[in-house]
Curated annotation (Swiss-Prot):
Active-site residues, record numbering mapped to chain: C10
Biological process annotations from GO: protein modification process
Tagged with keyword Kinase: no
Pfam families per UniProt: PMSR (PF01625)
Organism expressing this protein natively: Pseudarthrobacter chlorophenolicus (strain ATCC 700700 / DSM 12829 / CIP 107037 / JCM 12360 / KCTC 9906 / NCIMB 13794 / A6)
Lineage of the organism: Bacteria, Bacillati, Actinomycetota, Actinomycetes, Micrococcales
Identification of the protein by name: Peptide methionine sulfoxide reductase MsrA
């Protein structure tokens, strides 16, 4: 099993898609990349902690290649906008990838290079060593599955799921 810690806007969005991805055994929403030793949702949203909203995606490489997990990541958010994803604005929504090993760092950098051709502006995704992963509050775990009718889910997450179905249907569970 391998785990990638990825930030691409609101963690609910990435969580919703990766929860439906073949070979993914766990998705945990959380915070990382900042200086606050005890972040919570409200402090992270204040923009004062330096943390990003992220997901820790654990997957089985025997079922899904790491490159597919990373290419999905770049397809599911706009990695060319600094500190923003759509209406979600602030450093907590930055495009980010946090590595624990040199191998992961190389995979992340290769994914950026591979996906740059798909974008007309430079990718600004931050690639940093994972300092510590802080699990988000239970309310944020598997949010879409618990609240599919909520407005944010309908307007923001559903289009991302549709995009995943269009481009990655072979990798999604029915």
């Amino acid at each position: 099993m391998k785990t990638f810690v990825l930030g691409g806007g609101c963690f609910w969005c990435l969580d919703a898609v990766y929860q439906k991805t073949k070979g993914v055994t766990a998705v945990v929403s959380g915070y990382t990349g900042g200086h606050d030793p005890y972040p919570d949702y409200y402090s992270v949203c204040s923009g004062t902690t330096g943390h990003a909203e992220v997901v820790a995606v654990t997957f089985d490489e025997e079922i899904i290649p790491a490159e597919v997990i990373l290419d999905m990541f770049f397809a599911l958010h706009d990695p060319t906008t600094l500190n923003r994803q759509g209406y979600d604005v602030g450093t907590q929504y930055r495009s980010s990838m946090f590595y624990e090993t040199t191998e992961e760092k190389i995979l992340f950098e290769e994914a950026i290079d591979r996906n740059q051709a798909l974008w007309s502006h430079p990718i600004v995704t931050e690639v940093s060593r994972l300092p510590r992963f802080h699990v988000a509050e239970e309310f944020h775990q598997d949010y879409y599955a618990k609240h599919p009718e909520q407005g944010y889910c309908q307007v923001i997450i559903n289009p991302k799921l549709a995009k995943a179905r269009k481009y990655y249907s072979a990798w999604l569970n029915a």
